[in-house]
């Protein structure tokens, strides 16, 4: 387990004194105190960031203000969220929040719902429309042009996702007209980061939120959101490919660089604003290939 806290100078000093007998040397110049307590390491950085890593990370971190997350025990009466497109240069960013009740369990089992990464695109395109029809959800689709505008306004790759997850949950709660027992987000950042960014947002859900790694493997609501988001992303990529006249690949690899370079040569650099996430490194690589 890996837990990150931001502590004051006094708290860092107290921690260092408490675990001084466990202190070891660190080669990292930015670590001012390093200790190994059993199978758990404690790294205190000059910035005040403290990283607890190992089997007792949660226990030790709780001594300095960390509050352990309560993992929901039920699959139902729960909202789950997931996003797709954040790792792809071409195409937009899709975030979906879905609500699963007891009445949906049989249907979801029949559909063979699982994390979208474990399903073929063909399978996703088969079952996603049925999920969209049956499962209460809110899907937010941010086209590349809007994405670039939001990033230019001061958001970053993490804060834009926080804003979208937060808004999708808020809108779904309003749609349901009642609070779910739990909300689970497939973790894409630390809890501290999420809280920092979400505090700047206007609307906030009423139910407590839990961020979990690989939540799509644990909760059907997250898996449903994963599938719907992937479907929306594939549809968006298909639409943009048709509009541009180029087959736009998913992902952010060499093929994306080459296709982007072809678009630049054919339509000019400005054409990418409608098709791709410009802050990705692919933009500079494509410009180099296109010899701009």
Curated annotation (Swiss-Prot):
Keywords: Cytoplasm, Endonuclease, Hydrolase, Magnesium, Metal-binding, Nuclease
Binding site for a divalent metal cation: 82-83, 186
EC number: 3.1.26.4
EC class name: hydrolase
Reactions this protein catalyses: Endonucleolytic cleavage to 5'-phosphomonoester
GO cellular component: cytoplasm; ribonuclease H2 complex
Major location category of this protein: cytoplasm
GO biological process: DNA replication, removal of RNA primer; mismatch repair
Entry-linked Gene3D superfamilies: Ribonuclease H-like superfamily/Ribonuclease H, TATA-Binding Protein
GO molecular function, one term: RNA-DNA hybrid ribonuclease activity
Cofactor detail note: Manganese or magnesium. Binds 1 divalent metal ion per monomer in the absence of substrate. May bind a second metal ion after substrate binding.
Subcellular locations according to the entry: Cytoplasm
Domain RNase H type-2 span(s) in chain numbering: 76-292
Cofactors (names): Mn(2+); Mg(2+)
Pfam family, one: RNase_HII
UniProt similarity note: Belongs to the RNase HII family. RnhC subfamily.
HAMAP family in the cross-refs: RNase_HIII
Function summary: Endonuclease that specifically degrades the RNA of RNA-DNA hybrids.
Protein name: Ribonuclease HIII
Taxonomic source organism: Lactococcus lactis subsp. cremoris (strain MG1363)
Gene: rnhC
